[in-house]
């Protein structure tokens, strides 16, 4: 194969073969499918190139993308953020690597610190995991929230549009929610509607219909402490069922008014 033909590798597998002519790749066996009505129109091939998230700076991909040094150099990528602790860094002499060493918890702050340095040095960086679907997209989403000031939903949508295969696991998505709370916590609380704030009812249900509450002393009678009618003499008031005892000189008359 002439050198001129080798200047443009296959856009799917990244190797050099006459893919447009239907030649099978001698490295990975890839070949262009034959056009027919039986081929599903929505069928797409995963590109050998990583996805560009931020122009000329941030790229997202899989271990397969990270293993193709020639393609990385074609895109101008010089640094690699490896988010899988057990994943080997293949080209230490050609790229600057940084790895995350926690298998279960994504170290967002550590990753963002490395990406900040890459941006400062104007270096293009690839963030990758094994499949490029969950772990590395979660790290990129965290970076967008931290540095772009975007919320989780907006950052996730941005990444999903540029890498449709993104499928962040529930565990990592929960970590992103906690990371979002740490960034926008005070703003998220202030944005809450005051009507949504809980009321202190001490566990008792709130009575929405006040008409259902019982009403006492609704009769238009006067209070028992109001002045008695003038026709009733004061001495007629008694506090017991027995007749009043006659008063003596030593007794003090009780005022019943």
Curated annotation (Swiss-Prot):
- Record EC number: 3.1.3.48
User: Which tissues show it?
Assistant: Expressed in root tips and vasculature, cotyledons, stems, leaves vasculature and hydathodes, flowers, siliques, and seeds.
Q: Report the protein name in the record.
A: Protein-tyrosine-phosphatase IBR5
The entry describes its oligomerization and partners as:
Interacts with SKP1A/ASK1 and with MPK12.
Q: Where is this region: Disordered?
A: 235-257
Q: Which residues form the active site?
A: 129
Q: Which family does it belong to?
A: Belongs to the protein-tyrosine phosphatase family.
Alphabetical UniProt keywords: Abscisic acid signaling pathway, Auxin signaling pathway, Hydrolase, Nucleus, Protein phosphatase
Q: Name one GO biological process term.
A: regulation of organ growth
Q: Which Gene3D superfamilies match?
A: Protein tyrosine phosphatase superfamily (3.90.190.10)
- Pfam families cross-referenced by the UniProt entry: DSPc
Its UniProt entry gives the catalysed reaction(s) as: O-phospho-L-tyrosyl-[protein] + H2O = L-tyrosyl-[protein] + phosphate
Question: What is the annotated localization of this protein?
Answer: Nucleus
Record-linked SMART domains: DSPc (SM00195)
User: Which CDD domains would you find in this protein's record?
Assistant: DSP_plant_IBR5-like
Gene Ontology terms, cellular component aspect? nucleus
Q: Where is the Tyrosine-protein phosphatase domain?
A: 49-185
What does a knockout show? Answer: Impaired responses to phytohormones such as indole-3-butyric acid, indole-3-acetic acid (auxin), synthetic auxins, auxin transport inhibitors, and abscisic acid (ABA). Plants exhibit long roots and short hypocotyls when grown in the light, with aberrant vascular patterning, increased leaf serration, and reduced accumulation of auxin-inducible genes.
A GO molecular function annotation here is: protein tyrosine phosphatase activity
Tell me, in a sentence or two, what this protein's role is: Required for the transduction of auxin and abscisic acid (ABA) signaling pathways. Dephosphorylates and inactivates the MAP kinase MPK12.
């Amino acid at each position: 194969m002439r050198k001129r033909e080798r200047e443009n590798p296959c856009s799917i597998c990244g190797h050099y073969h006459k893919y447009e002519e239907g030649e099978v790749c001698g490295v990975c066996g890839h070949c262009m499918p034959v056009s027919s009505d039986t081929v599903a129109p929505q069928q797409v091939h995963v590109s050998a190139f990583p996805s560009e998230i931020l122009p000329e700076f941030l790229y997202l991909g899989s271990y397969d993308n990270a293993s193709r040094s020639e393609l990385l150099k074609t895109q101008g990528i010089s640094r690699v953020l490896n988010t899988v602790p057990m994943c080997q860094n293949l080209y230490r002499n050609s790229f600057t690597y940084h790895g995350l060493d926690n298998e279960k918890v994504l170290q967002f702050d550590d990753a963002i610190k490395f990406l900040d340095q890459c941006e400062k040095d104007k270096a293009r960086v690839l963030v990758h995991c094994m499949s490029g679907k969950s772990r590395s997209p979660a790290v990129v989403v965290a970076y967008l929230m931290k540095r772009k000031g975007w919320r989780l939903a907006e950052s996730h949508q941005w990444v999903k549009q540029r890498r449709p295969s993104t499928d962040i696991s529930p565990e990592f998505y929960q970590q992103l929610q906690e990371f979002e709370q740490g960034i926008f916590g005070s703003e998220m609380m202030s944005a809450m509607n005051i009507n949504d704030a809980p009321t202190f009812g001490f566990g008792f249900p709130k009575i929405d219909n006040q008409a259902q509450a019982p009403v006492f002393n609704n009769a238009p009678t006067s209070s028992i402490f109001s002045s008695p009618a003038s026709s009733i003499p004061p001495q007629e008031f008694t506090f017991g069922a027995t007749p009043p005892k006659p008063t003596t000189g030593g007794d003090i008359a009780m005022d019943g008014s």
